[in-house]
Design a protein with these regions (language model features):
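Non-catalytic structural connector segments
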Residues: 158-198
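Peptidoglycan glycan-strand catalytic modules in the bacterial/periplasmic cell-wall system
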Residues: 1-158
Length: 198
């Protein structure tokens, strides 16, 4: 398959962090925010839940400080892996493995370049670029093609592979299957999932 982590890392760093990222938070900060919220919900700590979601400078500073410590302790690949395991990849889909199973009926480790690019593109705006929503498919394909261009620029695929992949209609690549989704299927993280959804 494709180096999914490499593709996701290149996309996240080039497109989300350096590009038109919303909210001003780094990937590590977004991950920290989600982990803090998840932990507060697991602990049934309403005060910690409030502090994990409050829209204040204090919360941002707290996230930045924890992010700095995380970046000292963990590699970028480990942080990315953690983020990808809890990030949203479409309507009620969390984690890259679930997305790979849902959209393409394969494990994330077995994604090809087109599939990996499609999933990477969804992270920009999971509801807007969900490829299963017919009204989204044109925009989703445009985003996928931007990721394919980045993959070629970063050397993950050749220019020829990029051109062929971009000429492949998005709908022709989908092999949709039902997966366990929703808060009841998130195991220990059901409360976190429910909070995020509602």
């Amino acid at each position: 398959g494709v180096d999914v982590q490499g593709v996701m890392r290149a996309f996240v760093q080039t497109y989300l962090v350096k590009g038109s990222q919303q909210g001003g938070s780094s990937l590590t900060q977004q991950y920290v925010k989600n982990v803090l919220l998840m932990q507060a919900i697991e602990d049934n700590d309403s005060i910690a839940q409030y502090h994990a979601t409050e829209d204040t400078v204090a919360r941002k500073i707290r996230e930045m400080l924890i992010s700095v410590q995380m970046e000292k302790k963990y590699t970028k690949a480990e942080i990315l892996q953690g983020y990808l395991n809890i990030a949203q990849f479409g309507s009620n889909l969390y984690g890259v493995e679930t997305a790979a199973q849902r959209y393409f009926s394969v494990s994330a480790a077995d994604l090809n370049a087109v599939q990996a690019a499609t999933i990477a593109a969804i992270t920009k705006n999971p509801n807007k670029y969900d490829p299963l929503i017919e009204a989204n498919q044109e925009e989703s394909q445009k985003q996928r093609n931007l990721v394919l261009d980045l993959m070629a620029q970063e050397g993950y695929i050749s220019e020829k592979e990029c051109t062929e992949a971009k000429n492949t209609p998005l709908k022709d690549t989908l092999k949709v299957q039902d997966v366990n989704v929703g808060c009841q299927d998130t195991g220990d993280y059901a409360f976190f999932c429910d909070y995020v959804v509602h």
